[in-house]
Amino acid sequence: MPEPTTQIKDTTANPAPLGLLGFGMTTVLLNFHNAGYYELNSMVLAMGICYGGIAQVIAGLMEWKKGNTFATTAFISYGFFWLSLVALIGLPKLGFTAADETAMAVYLATWGLFTGGMFIGTFRLNRALQFVFGSLTILFFLLAWEHFYAVEWPGMGGASAGFKHFTGYEGLVCGGSAIYTGLAQVLNELYGKTILPLGVVKK
């Protein structure tokens, strides 16, 4: 007789809302700064380390346990993006050479390319995530453009404050969409029905 098999049911919670809210709330707070509402301060950096960084990495590890390659890649990557961004801001205070505007432009454009690739993956997921990753791709390239033109090439005046504020508002939209998507998953699961629609994609 064949030996009986034991199936282990996955009863762990959905970690995606944690990752989305960690990303979204930190993005919103940083982009209030970019939009001109306050100076860059320890509140933004602390959020970048704790909620945008560590919490997203934890969410990514939980997604790895569930076998979700896309979410694992996204959350761990963006978690370490926030940690690296805080390091780029903080390390010069410890005597390390600061990244110049060109280096920051390349850094942000590279993240834009990565996010564009992840955006293609959202075509198999839902409309809400498509908006999050699509708007994030645009945000990274706007930020890269801002730093590139801050170099003030001959004949160019550099990026204006208005452009930075525009980029900040785009970032607020991006971060807000991630918050919406995270809360939608929490509320829809809690109530057992669609409270906030995510725009299901037919596969």
List the model feature ranges, each with a label.
Residues 1-59, 63:
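N-terminal topogenic module of multi-pass integral membrane proteins
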Residues 33, 58-62, 84-96, 114-121:
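Membrane-helix exit/interface motif
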Residues 62-70, 120-131:
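Membrane-helix interface "capping/anchor" motifs
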Residues 72, 81-107:
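Helix-adjacent hinge/juxtasegments
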Residues 106-117, 127-153, 160-184:
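Alpha-helical membrane segments in multi-pass integral membrane proteins
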